[in-house]
Amino acid sequence: MITLDTLTEYLRQMMPDAAVTVSDRTGTMDHLKVVVISAAFAGKNLLDRHRLIYQALDSPLKDGRIHALELTARTSDELER
């Protein structure tokens, strides 16, 4: 289990400008929906964006604190369209 604040900090260490929204999908705090808005995604395809998020969350994924992720990764420009 991981807290929402801790998960957000992992992401912001890799992407300091990130706006992060996390929601618990099951009530167990290990199945999470994560929305990340960051300029770091500019010019990257979906797979590369997800890789960046997985790199940031490597530790809690490997130690089992996160079991499943539903990801949305956008730039702020993409939100405005």
Question: What does each model-found stretch correspond to?
Answer:
Residues 25, 37, 72-76:
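Short loop/turn motifs enriched for small/polar and acidic residues
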Residues 17-33:
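Short edge beta-strands and adjacent turn/loop segments
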Residues 1-19:
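N-proximal, solvent-exposed amphipathic alpha-helical segments enriched in charged/polar residues
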Residues 27-29, 41, 78:
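Short Gly/Pro-enriched loop/turn and capping motifs at secondary-structure junctions
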Residues 54-81:
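C-terminal structural segments of small proteins and small subunits
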Residues 7, 11, 47-64:
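Short, non-transmembrane amphipathic alpha-helical segments
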